[in-house]
């Protein structure tokens, strides 16, 4: 029987919590926006971790790229801090990726709202 909650998922969840605190407390770069860790995917061999982030209130591609650059530059430092806080034999290399799912979700919600409003408008016109 397969495990419902694998070791890599547990490591990813713990890394997500730890990284959220470490980025907030340890990264002192004033250019860094309000970063939210939306998920961490750890490879099966625990050598690499994809860290998905969003940046609060910054949809500008240039600002997002700057935040990604800052985090990727600090990846080694964050990895060292993770090694101290987590009891792992080897700490995965961190690879930061921008999570566009929230932006896409907001766009889809706006499209649905527009479609519903248009249907209501057409429904009101046909009743007249």
UniProtKB/Swiss-Prot annotation:
SUPFAM superfamilies: Ribosome-binding factor A, RbfA. Keywords: Cytoplasm, Ribosome biogenesis. Pfam families: RBFA (PF02033). HAMAP family: RbfA. GO terms for biological process: maturation of SSU-rRNA. GO terms for cellular component: cytosol. It is found in: Cytoplasm. This is Ribosome-binding factor A.
């Amino acid at each position: 029987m397969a495990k419902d909650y694998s070791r890599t998922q547990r490591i990813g969840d713990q890394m997500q919590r730890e990284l959220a605190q470490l980025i907030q407390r340890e990264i002192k770069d004033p250019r860094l926006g309000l970063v939210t860790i939306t998920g961490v995917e750890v490879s099966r061999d625990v050598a690499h971790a994809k860290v998905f982030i969003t940046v609060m209130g910054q949809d500008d591609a240039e600002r997002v790229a700057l935040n990604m650059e800052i985090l990727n530059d600090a990846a080694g430092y964050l990895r060292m801090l993770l090694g101290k806080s987590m009891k792992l034999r080897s700490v995965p290399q961190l690879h930061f990726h921008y999570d566009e799912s929230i932006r896409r979700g907001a766009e889809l919600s706006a499209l649905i709202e527009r479609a519903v409003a248009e249907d209501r408008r057409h429904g009101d016109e046909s009743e007249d």
